[in-house]
Amino acid sequence: MSEMAELSELYEESSDLQMDVMPGEGDLPQMEVGSGSRELSLRPSRSGAQQLEEEGPMEEEEAQPMAAPEGKRSLANGPNAGEQPGQVAGADFESEDEGEEFDDWEDDYDYPEEEQLSGAGYRVSAALEEADKMFLRTREPALDGGFQMHYEKTPFDQLAFIEELFSLMVVNRLTEELGCDEIIDRE
């Protein structure tokens, strides 16, 4: 019974921890990225235990510069005086009218499939291609031979065959009697 009590306590603690993490609780301060200082404060949770809460930027963020060096423009600084808000321009960017298109890298990229195989790799590839051709040439006759060897095991609907045969014989006689074959030959 004590195991059940321990499990229920663990379940309650885990659900409390999950509820503390869920967004929209309102107990966490709303902060912008990179603002504030890094301070540790103790905050009581619903279960009564105190938890550590970190505020402010992380150490990696402090080590990196927050602003772009002077002379270079970043997206956070906004557009220059001559630019419209939705337009991004710089020394590195060229419009499609002024220079090459962006997808020209595909022309310069060497695809491994296009490289010539040399040595043992080429011989193995050629042998596999030859075996594939041989298989394709022998597959159909082998299937036909297998059918002929085991024809007694294959299903054959004699009634359907006889009906089809008689219908073709009747159609052929009717076309001869009516002279339809002469009309078909003229066209």
From Swiss-Prot:
**What organism is recorded for this protein?**
Homo sapiens (Human)
Q: Which domain of life, per UniProt?
A: Eukaryota
GO function terms (MF aspect): histone acetyltransferase binding; transcription corepressor activity
Q: List the disulfide bonds.
A: none
**Induction of its expression:** Down-regulated in differentiating U-937 leukemia cells.
The record's subcellular location field reads: Nucleus; Cytoplasm
Motif mapping: LXCXE motif: 178-182
Q: What is this protein called?
A: EP300-interacting inhibitor of differentiation 1
Report the function annotation for this chain: Interacts with RB1 and EP300 and acts as a repressor of MYOD1 transactivation. Inhibits EP300 and CBP histone acetyltransferase activity. May be involved in coupling cell cycle exit to the transcriptional activation of genes required for cellular differentiation. May act as a candidate coinhibitory factor for NR0B2 that can be directly linked to transcription inhibitory mechanisms.
Give the UniProt record's GO annotations in the biological process aspect: cell differentiation; negative regulation of DNA-templated transcription; negative regulation of transcription by RNA polymerase II
Distribution of this protein across tissues and organs? Widely expressed. Most abundantly expressed in heart, skeletal muscle, pancreas, brain and testis. Expressed at much lower levels in placenta and peripheral blood leukocyte. Barely detectable in lung.
**Taxonomic path:** Eukaryota, Metazoa, Chordata, Craniata, Vertebrata
Cellular component GO terms held in the UniProt record: cytoplasmic ribonucleoprotein granule; nucleoplasm
Assembly behavior: Interacts via its LXCXE motif with the entire pocket region of RB1. Interacts with EP300, NR0B2 and TRIM27.
Query: What InterPro entries would the database entry show?
Result: EID
Q: What else is known?
A: Inhibition of MYOD1 may be partly due to the ability of EID1 to bind and inhibit EP300 histone acetyltransferase activity.
The main place the protein resides is nucleus
Give positions of region: Interaction with NR0B2: 54-120
UniProt KW keywords: Cell cycle, Cytoplasm, Differentiation, Nucleus, Repressor, Transcription, Transcription regulation, Ubl conjugation
Q: What does the entry's PTM section describe?
A: Ubiquitinated in U2OS osteosarcoma cells and is rapidly degraded by proteasome as cells exit the cell cycle exit.
Q: Where is the composition biased (Acidic residues)?
A: 52-63, 93-116
User: Quick one: where's region Disordered?
Assistant: 1-118
